[in-house]
Amino acid sequence: MATVQKSQHSHFFLLVGCIVHLSNFCSTTTAQFDYFKLVLQWPNSYCSLKTTHCPRTRLPSQFTIHGLWPDNKSWPLSNCRDTSADVLKITDKGLIQDLAVHWPDLTRRQRKVPGQKFWVTQWKKHGACALPMYSFNDYFVKALELKKRNNVLDMLSRKSLTPGDQRVDVSDVNGAITKVTGGIAILKCPEGYLTEVIICFDPSGFPVIDCPGPFPCKDDPLEFQVLSRRKFQDL
């Protein structure tokens, strides 16, 4: 009986210690995550939104990366503490050029030598949640790998869903993606534009899994533009 009471007292003081010193007593040094969300955006739709300004004369003619987000099914992950000793700078010139093509900042003018602040911000907000499984550099390599392995524009074109004046149905877009990946994707369609496609993966990046939702797009026809209706100017 005395042993049981002693154990209960120990748990009580541990709980009190956690409450008083939560930041350094009970916190884990690394974030755990259940799955990856690869968020891809269609540039013409994204740059057509009323709240978006894209100062580029030419937009990419492919889906580009918005982000690679580690996440949990029980609670959302973001702004995880970076406990690594990595210097937050990409030194591989080939990787930088690859990111400039596949993960550009559409709200900034295109440059011959891309700045890295945009990608570092993505790491701090989302990528660090993938530690310790993925380092700073590995995180961007994985994002590019998943994006190249899942060509959404090609998936849609196989079902004759191509950018243009004709609208596309949400169910048709979902069906075309599931047909190839085997998983249920999430679509984002603000202002009636097919703007984002989110594909979910096991933490290793394989296989594709069903995204847990929510699924914000109603089953209404969406605009999938080949040319933006907004005017762009190179600043």
Swiss-Prot record:
GO terms for molecular function: ribonuclease T2 activity; RNA binding. It is found in: Secreted, Extracellular space. RNA binds at Q41, H66, D105, L106, R108, F118, K125, H126. It comes from the Eukaryota. Keywords: Disulfide bond, Endonuclease, Glycoprotein, Hydrolase, Lyase, Nuclease, Secreted, Signal. The active site is at H66, Q122, H126. InterPro entries: Ribonuclease_T2_eukaryotic, RNase_T2-like, RNase_T2-like_sf, RNase_T2_His_AS_1, RNase_T2_His_AS_2. Glycans are attached at N72. It is an enzyme of class 4 (lyase). One of its GO terms (biological process) is RNA catabolic process. CDD domains: RNase_T2_euk. Self-incompatibility (SI) is the inherited ability of a flowering plant to prevent self-fertilization by discriminating between self and non-self pollen during pollination. In many species, self-incompatibility is controlled by the single, multiallelic locus S. This is Ribonuclease S-2. It comes from Antirrhinum hispanicum (Snapdragon). The gene is S2.
